[in-house]
UniProtKB/Swiss-Prot annotation:
It comes from Rhodopseudomonas palustris (strain HaA2). This is Large ribosomal subunit protein bL31. GO terms for cellular component: ribonucleoprotein complex; ribosome. The lineage of its organism: Bacteria, Pseudomonadati, Pseudomonadota, Alphaproteobacteria, Hyphomicrobiales. Binds the 23S rRNA. SUPFAM superfamilies: L28p-like (SSF143800).
Length: 75
């Protein structure tokens, strides 16, 4: 295997939306960094039965709805 071509693989802390933390290894960030999740399996509508609304982060959902609002409408 070639040396010095692989990214640094180190320990980080992942913080779930409910505050739960766990340790894992990743190439993200630096050793000891915390990765705060906005959506995780406990809060994502796909895994919770869709009872919660998806956050409109940066207006993306609004732009999509505006762009395709008339796509399936019949005249």
């Amino acid at each position: 295997m070639k040396t010095e071509i692989h990214p640094d693989y180190h320990n980080i802390t992942v913080v779930m939306t409910d505050g739960t933390e766990y340790q894992t290894r990743s190439t993200w960030g630096k050793e000891g960094d915390k990765l705060n999740l906005d959506i995780d399996p406990r809060s994502h509508p796909a895994w919770t039965g869709g009872t919660q609304q998806v956050l409109d982060r940066g207006g993306r959902v609004s732009r999509f709805q505006k762009k395709f609002s008339g796509f399936l409408k019949k005249d």
